[in-house]
């Protein structure tokens, strides 16, 4: 999925932040043919998932220099998918030590301390995701949000947006129902920005609220230029 209108997307924002902080990035060869495996796993396509797992782990083992570098992913649901693969990596003597980190956690720990925020938003509506919750990344998410905005608002009725990969595209009524209450809370006022950490969730929340949601790293990149 492409970035929200006027945005650059999470990957270019992450690369910009790394360059600004003096952190080198290595992109695996053939990355356009790699996947976290969630589309196969979530639909029960076991054989396809196993094939992709073997392909991804072999590629990342080479790209990380045998596990010397962390693998950073810029979409929370994909990080969760790779984290599931990590259990297989831990059981395999061929790929010991592969480490998967969500970009929000990596930026909070290794990038944010090296940056200077030069312009803040007045207010930001923030949507944590199911995957960021499972990964334990919500503290990092809120810390970055606080760095880019004077006020951070997570709706009291926050919960799953029910976009669930392609479910929100095929059955938009699921997202409409799941987000009704939190959308009302968000739309009770106007915010300077709307952020999350996963493109499909951003699409779901954009549909629910009528406001354009973008990845939190896009806001951080803009705030530190």
Kindly label every feature range from the protein language model.
Residues 1-225:
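Iron-sulfur cluster-binding electron-transfer modules in prokaryotic oxidoreductases
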